[in-house]
Amino acid sequence: MGHSVAGVCLEEPAVLTAFPSLLHPQDPPQQRDRILFVTAELSDFVKVGGLGDFSAALPRVLRRQHAVRVLLPGYRQVLERCSDLRILGSLPGRAAIPPCEIGLVTLDDGLEVMLVLCPLLYEREGTPYMDDQGNDWADNHLRFARLCLAAAEIAGGHGAQGWQPGLVHANDWPSALTPAYMAWNGVRTPSLFTIHNLAYQGLCDLQCSAELGLPDEALSPESMEFHGRLSFLKAGIAHAHHITTVSETYAQEITTPEYGCGLHGILKCKVEKRQLSGIVNGIDDSWQPHCDPHLVAGFSARQWAGKRANTRYVEERFGLEPGKGPLFAVVSRLVQQKGIDLTLEISDALLQAGGRLVSIGRGEPSLEKAMLDLSRRHPGQVGVHIGFDETDARRIYAGSDFLLMPSRYEPCGLSQLYAQCFGSLPIARCTGGLADTIVDGVTGFLFREETAQSYLDAVLRAINVYHCPALLNAMRCKAMAAPMFWRDSVEPYNRLYRRLLRNTAPAWRGVRP
């Protein structure tokens, strides 16, 4: 049953994540609706953040009840790993958007992935969004408009040898123009748009409208005009039949000026129309501490010896003095949003209280330098690696006592769920998905104020618990039992899909915030 919090219509909570290890028996094909899942990332091939994980996991669990195809740009690194690509058809260009072909590849577990093949736009060195120097591609508006236009045309029955979806699910700004192009093309297929991070809006100049082949109505505040620019994200919000976010609390937060990034007005209108809901992300089946092959040794809530073995690995790997107080971990991008500056601000007090700190991740150069400087000032107490390694990250979750997540905002967050699964108690700011997935004093520690003092108070509470082994183990056991898995929690999406498939009314349009 859905429920309402602070005026936001929310679906029943689900804990959802992202990884490709989920296979289910499927219903007979004739009973399954066709779903087109549009994304800029798929962790099987290319991943920048949580979107890649989400896009790999949700379509897989949805396949039990639906015939799902993922639509992804044909990046160079994707094509290099596709040996059995089959061309389905071609689509024309529009304005400055070049034509493309649509290819199909079937992954080992049966997931079907359609690729937008456009060498001019996608076959480059770098990430999906940036060149190898870390600069945004200057033609990103064209690159992702091509993805969105292809999705809209496939929804209209073109380019995929007759395969036509009954519902289109777009994700974040790179695919946000999909519901808009569908509306402008006269395609009445229902559309769902998931916001993973409202702060990334896909902005470009108004003059780009001609290159994108936009109708005049697109330039209005009721569509994608945003303070004198064009916003891909706003287009998705304005034209999709329903909007979801990746946690219930984040769905509430983005309707406020503090978190709404200038879009709180249109999002409030979505609430009034019951077209905004939150479904919490969660974790994949691979996060099982008793059998994870990445770990030095497995462990469980009944047998902790393996956790201690992972702690010893982390101590040796990061040059920490063994067995000297609680081990705090940072597994994160080193950016302001994640509150890394707050961790640096309290680090001396944390260390003076007997704590140790290990950090893995990369991000803003100034924060990378500050973390390295901290480790140099405190050899044996602080270990830092700039970069990311999946095996080391998992061993840090397993070997640490506490995970630090003082995020300024956090649409969902996955690290706190991974940590809980591995018996590391998260210390986090009470925002977004962190508020939805951590029970203060039970499965972790929460603080509300965005201040170093509030954060430090939570850290000191955690240190007090560390020195009470019975309480520490009780909290660890509860934390390890807390996270849910995709296989258990896909039903809110299934219910939402069924509702949208029953109602194909034209998308409601928002108002200027």
From Swiss-Prot:
GO terms for biological process: glycogen biosynthetic process. GO terms for molecular function: alpha-1,4-glucan glucosyltransferase (ADP-glucose donor) activity; alpha-1,4-glucan glucosyltransferase (UDP-glucose donor) activity. It is an enzyme of class 2 (transferase). It holds the Pfam family Glycos_transf_1. The keyword Glycosyltransferase applies. Its EC number is 2.4.1.21. It catalyses: [(1->4)-alpha-D-glucosyl](n) + ADP-alpha-D-glucose = [(1->4)-alpha-D-glucosyl](n+1) + ADP + H(+). It comes from the Bacteria. Pathway: Glycan biosynthesis; glycogen biosynthesis. Keywords: Glycogen biosynthesis, Glycosyltransferase, Transferase. Synthesizes alpha-1,4-glucan chains using ADP-glucose. Belongs to the glycosyltransferase 1 family. Bacterial/plant glycogen synthase subfamily. This is Glycogen synthase. It comes from Pseudomonas paraeruginosa (strain DSM 24068 / PA7) (Pseudomonas aeruginosa (strain PA7)). The lineage of its organism: Bacteria, Pseudomonadati, Pseudomonadota, Gammaproteobacteria, Pseudomonadales. The gene is glgA.
